[in-house]
Curated annotation (Swiss-Prot):
InterPro entries: Cro/C1-type_HTH (IPR001387), Lambda_DNA-bd_dom_sf (IPR010982). This is SPbeta prophage-derived uncharacterized HTH-type transcriptional regulator YopS. The keyword RNA-binding does not apply. The keyword Ligase does not apply. SMART domains: HTH_XRE. Residues 11-66 form the HTH cro/C1-type domain.
Length: 74
């Protein structure tokens, strides 16, 4: 069995690297600022693949770069 734990959200760090704000990311992706904030605070962690792809495309990264992940194989 494979267990995946979601760690820290890396969206703010990726925004800093691209020199854009969360507000700008919201405008680029069409995702509400509050929703992006919820992902960052881990209030929401199960974002849809479409949402993850939109954020990743805007930040020029891969979907798996949006969060730290811990994968355990049992």
């Amino acid at each position: 069995m494979i267990k995946v734990e979601i760690g820290q959200c890396l969206i703010p760090e990726l925004c800093r690297k691209k020199d854009i704000t969360i507000n700008e990311l919201s405008e680029i992706t069409g995702i509400k600022k509050q929703q992006l904030s919820d992902y960052n605070r881990l209030v929401k962690v199960d974002m849809s693949i479409r949402t993850a792809k939109r954020i990743a495309a805007a930040l020029d990264c891969n979907v798996e770069d949006l969060y730290e992940f811990k994968v355990e194989r049992h």
